[in-house]
Amino acid sequence: MELFSKILLVITLTTAFLSDTCAQERSIGTSWSFTGIGLTYDHLVKETAFVHVGAQLEMTETFIGRARIPGGSVSFTWNDILGSTTSRNGNRISFFTGAGAAAGYCKDFRVKRKEQVRYGSFFGLKGRAGVKIEYDRNINITAAVAPVLGMHLFKKEETVMMRYYRYGLLQTLMPELTISYRF
């Protein structure tokens, strides 16, 4: 977990101190979904794009009782705002999509009942698509899907095994809800 904290710190500091974006809008919050819970940081880079950085406890196996300890992951996506509108009461509604990367350490989904799945590292490309509502009281609520197309590495006996990251694909079906404070 110490490495996890250092990676998140480096990503956050790099994003926060980009020279062209220091005066832009930022938000920090929490995300919830069936796949896990986490902390998020969004940084508006320009009027039509924002950066999303997330650190998440991978809880799927924990929620269904197959693991005692959750895994962890970090992710980074560059999101383009496809369109936005303002409601009658001043709230801004934006539709976005983006791409980036994710990496972490967790237990992957098992397909067969007798299959043993071990903890291991994963990495891959991450997509993100959703809708963000920006309220006039500096609160954002975002609903998004964020699949990861990647690989899962784990040790089986004395061999390192690699296969596609199954939970990354299942995240397409499990939307996440994020509530954040904008400053």
Predicted regions, residues:
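Predominantly the C-terminal beta-signal and adjacent terminal strand-loop region
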Residues: 136-183
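Short N-terminal segments immediately surrounding and downstream of signal-peptide cleavage
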Residues: 25-41
